[in-house]
Amino acid sequence: MENNNYNNHVSGENSGGQRGHFFYGGNQVLGGAAPIYGRGGDCYDPMIVKTEGGGSTSHHNHTFHYPSIIRNHHHDSTETSGGGAGAGEVIEALKAKIIAHPQCSNLLDAYMDCQKVGAPPEVAARLSAVRQEFEARQRRSLTDRDVSKDPELDQFMEAYYDMLVKYREELTRPLQEAMEFMQKIEAQLNMLGNAPVRIFNSEDKCEGVGSSEEDQDNSGGETELPEIDPRAEDRELKNHLLRKYSGYLSSLKQELSKKKKKGKLPKDARQKLITWWELHYKWPYPSESEKVALAESTGLDQKQINNWFINQRKRHWKPSEDMQFMVMDGLHPQSAAALYMEGHYMGEGPFRLGQ
């Protein structure tokens, strides 16, 4: 039978691997007292689809309500031959209906996709060749057969196909995550090193992760290492650190610039203080009432006004010797300013100290 030859060939290809294997065709499925692997001795028991992989075994219990087909075939064969037909003819008829079903090709493709996950390219190519050979045999065997509609068989084929598609997704997900992790490590090594580092060939897909024997023979077991310039490594490390921490440095620079700008007074308020300074340059000591007025006009508090006048006098004003003597004699600054303005100690006319 073509189906038996196909399953024996595929099982031989996968005998040395650790990937999951499906048992849905061949002698395990349609021969003997157990039509599908994982079922009991009674062919009318609910169907159990079993998958094995790695060291773990998982059972997917799907009740397809398909034994009624077997009962119908068994009933028809009993009436035709008077009970002389065995269970083998019933199983062969059921197997023929499965092979002749339009969904059988899609079911086979889904199974082959599961087998190709993580397989080397040569193994994937052999699996594709086996699949094409089986499909050709299937077309030749279906030329003289009449395909009748069977809703229960349609339900079984669709459910089994969906299960294989989901199983392929589960097999592909960890392999894809591993490949993404290796690409990330490869990119980090390329940034730190001078020459590009290739952990695996990026052109290989999930179906061809392994390397062929020809590549290993041509390499001769030797790998040429590029010459490394220490200065190039320093430059690469510097660029890597700049790319990594440039955001932190720019944010820190902005924060420091904000702190520096925080000490500056508003432009309008500063201009009003400078105007008062120029008008009272001979004695730039505002009284408490003047400080209150300046605070109201500039919108600043008295502490800011006091600090501004202190810094302004330290940087831009120097009292005359007469004013210094008056302060040393204990005269109040305001009284000294009044005397100074009246010209008791200085001549009349405009005069700017410190000029």
From Swiss-Prot:
A molecular function (GO) term: DNA binding
Chief place of localization: nucleus
Entry annotated with the keyword DNA-binding: yes
Signal peptide (from-to): none
Domain ELK span(s) in chain numbering: 236-256
Keywords attached to this entry: DNA-binding, Homeobox, Nucleus
Organs and tissues of expression: Expressed in the apical meristems, in the newly emerged lateral primordia in the floral bud, in their vascular bundles and in the cortex parenchyma of the floral pedicle. Also present in the lateral tips of leaf primordia.
Feature: DNA-binding region: 257-320
PANTHER family: HOMEOBOX PROTEIN TRANSCRIPTION FACTORS
Role: Appears to be involved in meristem formation and in the regulation of leaf morphology. Misexpression makes the leaf more compound which is always associated with growth retardation and loss of apical dominance, resulting in dwarfed, bushy plants. Probably binds to the DNA sequence 5'-TGAC-3'.
Domain of life: Eukaryota
Residue span of region Disordered: 205-233
Localization (cell): Nucleus
GO terms under cellular component: nucleus
Protein name: Homeotic protein knotted-1
One Pfam family, short name: KNOX2
Gene3D superfamilies for this protein: Homeodomain-like
Family according to the record: Belongs to the TALE/KNOX homeobox family.
Higher taxonomy: Eukaryota, Viridiplantae, Streptophyta, Embryophyta, Tracheophyta
